[in-house]
């Protein structure tokens, strides 16, 4: 029995001039999601999807590569200006912002949206190494 060929639908590139880059940086990984102004995701990458495994996902270099790849896809969709919202205490925060600028996106505003507890949950205990 012959296999049926399925026609692949090619994605049309949209023209989105402005957007928002959401950087979620934890100690273990960094996730970069670039959305349009309404919040619809245009592209996203993380340390893991960029080819890093284990503890290397949390490094600034992994965050830099993830931001470059996400910015490349966003620029293919016509994005030129981006507003950056950074969340979390990780090491890839600054590396992501620098990488977005180096990729050719114009950063208009940088906002820190890290959630701060008003004495909510008990934090994890200190590591003894």
Curated annotation (Swiss-Prot):
Gene Ontology CC entries for this record: cytosolic small ribosomal subunit
Record Pfam families: Ribosomal_S11
Tagged with keyword Transport: no
Keyword rRNA-binding: yes
Keyword line: Ribonucleoprotein, Ribosomal protein, RNA-binding, rRNA-binding
Biological processes annotated in GO: translation
GO molecular function: rRNA binding; structural constituent of ribosome
Residue ranges crossing the lipid bilayer per the database entry: none
Xref: HAMAP family: Ribosomal_uS11
Known function: Located on the platform of the 30S subunit, it bridges several disparate RNA helices of the 16S rRNA. Forms part of the Shine-Dalgarno cleft in the 70S ribosome.
Subunit structure as annotated in this protein's UniProt entry: Part of the 30S ribosomal subunit. Interacts with proteins S7 and S18. Binds to IF-3.
NCBIfam families assigned: PRK05309.1, uS11_bact
Annotated family: Belongs to the universal ribosomal protein uS11 family.
Protein name (record): Small ribosomal subunit protein uS11
Native species: Fusobacterium nucleatum subsp. nucleatum (strain ATCC 25586 / DSM 15643 / BCRC 10681 / CIP 101130 / JCM 8532 / KCTC 2640 / LMG 13131 / VPI 4355)
